[in-house]
Amino acid sequence: MGIYLSTPKTDKFSEDGENDKLKLGLSSMQGWRANMEDAHSALLNLDNETSFFGVFDGHGGRVVAKFCAKYLHSQVLRSEAYSAGDLGTAVHRAFFRMDEMMRGQRGWRELSALGDKINKIGGMIEGLIWSPRGSDSNNGQDDWSFEEGPHSDFAGPTCGCTACVALIRNNQLVVANAGDSRCVISRAGQAYNLSRDHKPELEAERDRIVKAGGFIHMGRINGSLNLTRAIGDMEFKQNKFLPPEKQIVTANPDINVVELCDDDDFLVLACDGIWDCMSSQQLVDFIHEHIQKESSLSAVCERVLDRCLAPSTIGGEGCDNMTMVLVQFKKPITQNKKADVGEQSVKGVEEAEINAAEENGS
C-alpha cells in the first residue's frame, strides 16, 4: 500500500461542547492518506478555571500523536508551575516531558499498547478527548523512569508529531507550538497567527540544525524530515553533549501569551492538512461565513474539511489527514479595555511572532 488510498475516507469524528465561557466544535478526517496519524485533545474544564485544546499531527507513524493526546495535558496539570499559575512554563515543560516519558520500559509499554489499540480498530478514526483523571493524573508518584524490564534501554520512538496547544484561563490565552500545525485567532474578523511554522528554511532553525551536526537537503532535515521541531523523532536527538533545546530536532515550543478582549471571535487549531489548502485569513473568513448558518461548530469544521479535500491525489494539496478544533468565545469576554494581541510574554520562554495573516501570506 502506498501513502494514498484509491478513494478517500471521508467519514469524520466530530464533537461539540461548551461551558460558561466557551463553545467548542472539532472534526477530524483521514482523507486520502493510507493511515490516520492525527490526534487531538479537548478539555473544556481541565480544572475549574482552565480549558485545554491540542492538535497533534503524526509523521512516520501515529503512536506519538496518540501518546501526546493522552498524556500532555496531565503533565501540564501536575506541574509545580501550573499550581503557581504560570501556564506558559507548565506547558513548556510538558512538551519536553513527552520525550522523557516515551523512553525506557514504561515508554515502550505505553507506545506498544497505543499501537495495538490503533491496529485493532482497523484504520477507523478514533476520537481522543481524554479526561484529566486518567492513568497519569495529577495524583500519585511520577514513576515512569523507575519501571524496569527488557526494554529499559529503549531510546524512544523514531516517529514523531507536531504539537499545537492552547490553554485558556480567565482572560489569558497561552499557545505552545512545536512543528507546523497552527493556532489562529480571529479578532474583529482579522486573522492573527499565534504560532509560527517551524520549517528548515527559517534561519534560526537552520543554524541550530547545522550546529547540532545535521544538514538540510531539498528542504528536509538530513534529507528526511520537513519540519524542525517535534515531539518524538528520537533519531535526531542523540547528541549527548547538547541539551534538548539544541538538538537537531527539538520539542522546544514557542510560547505566546495573549490577553483576550471582546473583539476576539474564535480560536482555531489545525494541522497542516488544513493550512496547506487555506491561508489563515481565508479560513477565518470561511468560518465567519458559515458559523451562523450551521447548527453546530463541529458542522463548521466538517465544512472546512470537505472544502479542503482534494478531488484526486494529483498535486498533493488536500490529500493529508485533517484535524480542526474551533473554540468560540462567549461575550462579554472581559470588561477591561481592549488589549493588544501578544502584549504579554512568558518570562524565560521565547515568544512566538504574531503577524496579521495577510502580512506573511499565511
From Swiss-Prot:
Enzyme's top EC category = hydrolase
InterPro entries the record matches: PP2C, PP2C_BS, PPM-type-like_dom_sf, PPM-type_phosphatase-like_dom
Instruction: Report the family membership.
Output: Belongs to the PP2C family.
Matching Pfam families, A to Z?
PP2C
Q: What is this protein called?
A: Probable protein phosphatase 2C 11
Record's cofactor remark: Binds 2 magnesium or manganese ions per subunit.
Q: Where does Mn(2+) 2 bind?
A: 57, 272, 320
Q: Which GO terms describe its molecular function?
A: metal ion binding; protein serine/threonine phosphatase activity
Q: Which UniProt keywords apply?
A: Hydrolase, Magnesium, Manganese, Metal-binding, Protein phosphatase
What organism is listed for this UniProt entry? Oryza sativa subsp. japonica
Annotated ranges, domain PPM-type phosphatase: 23-329
